[in-house]
Amino acid sequence: MIIVTGGAGFIGSNIVKALNDKGITDILVVDNLKDGTKFVNLVDLNIADYMDKEDFLIQIMAGEEFGEIEAIFHEGACSSTTEWDGKYMMDNNYQYSKELLHYCLEREIPFLYASSAATYGGRTSDFIESREYEQPLNVYGYSKFLFDEYVRQILPEANSQIVGFRYFNVYGPREGHKGSMASVAFHLNTQLNNGESPKLFEGSDGFKRDFVYVGDVADVNLWFWENGVSGIFNLGTGRAESFQAVADATLAFHKKGSIEYIPFPDKLKGRYQAFTQADLTNLRKAGYDKPFKTVAEGVTEYMAWLNRDA
């Protein structure tokens, strides 16, 4: 069996899909369906079982067995970069992850988990997986950074696989439940379909992020599991592209609309990553050599998926 925490969420459900595409269906999805809209991410997928996150954590802490586990993909977390409840964030992202990690280490189960580019904070260069480059801007980034630091202490002694992926700006299918935290591409598409002018912040040609397609993210996860490589790795494309490029690809698909530029909100000033670009040196050294989709390629594929029933 394979366990995917956060399996009804954005990246988790895409990992379930990638496993299904390889003929793997013996999957336990762990999630919190308090947000009932997330179930739509699972309706076209094949899984063996579902468990609530709280029940799962109780069983993990009690050391209960789930049968033979081939791997745990730990994608379950509070991923809101605007959540400032530090206790909630640390319980959800740090303590929960530690419990799962030790469960896996004791049983030599491969443990693949979601870290984040938020660990780098407001940098504009050198997004490198090393302590001197890490200075998170928000409590979400701090919770991810702290767990990475914890993993770094354990990695040299570990007898089983531990791998963390620092996701950059992931976009693509199955993110609709994320609301305001969904990608720019998702929001632009919604605005166009509602007959509204698609909106970007003023200066969006100057805001550049490493936008990575979720299908590529799932592919990297599975490759590392299949190849048993451990470590903490950036997971982006290695290219910074502008929000304007995302908008251009969206408009090109729809063949209509023009962008309305809105003022940059005061509440985000100083807490907003204006530039991200993954350094892929370590990922490539580990042996992953496949190309990543450009914004034009990924957004076009995503638009086709979003508008498949239109």
UniProtKB/Swiss-Prot annotation:
It catalyses: ADP-D-glycero-beta-D-manno-heptose = ADP-L-glycero-beta-D-manno-heptose. Keywords: Carbohydrate metabolism, Isomerase, NADP. InterPro entries: Epimerase_deHydtase, Heptose_epim, NAD(P)-bd_dom_sf. NADP(+) binds at residues 10-11, 31-32, 38, 53, 75-79, 92, 144, 170, 178. Its cofactor is NADP(+). Substrate binds at N169, S180, H187, F201, E202, G203, S204, R209, Y272. Its EC number is 5.1.3.20. GO terms for molecular function: ADP-glyceromanno-heptose 6-epimerase activity; NADP binding. Transmembrane segments: none annotated. Pathway: Nucleotide-sugar biosynthesis; ADP-L-glycero-beta-D-manno-heptose biosynthesis; ADP-L-glycero-beta-D-manno-heptose from D-glycero-beta-D-manno-heptose 7-phosphate: step 4/4. One of its GO terms (biological process) is carbohydrate metabolic process. The active site is at Y140, K178. Catalyzes the interconversion between ADP-D-glycero-beta-D-manno-heptose and ADP-L-glycero-beta-D-manno-heptose via an epimerization at carbon 6 of the heptose. Belongs to the NAD(P)-dependent epimerase/dehydratase family. HldD subfamily. This is ADP-L-glycero-D-manno-heptose-6-epimerase. The lineage of its organism: Bacteria, Pseudomonadati, Pseudomonadota, Gammaproteobacteria, Enterobacterales.
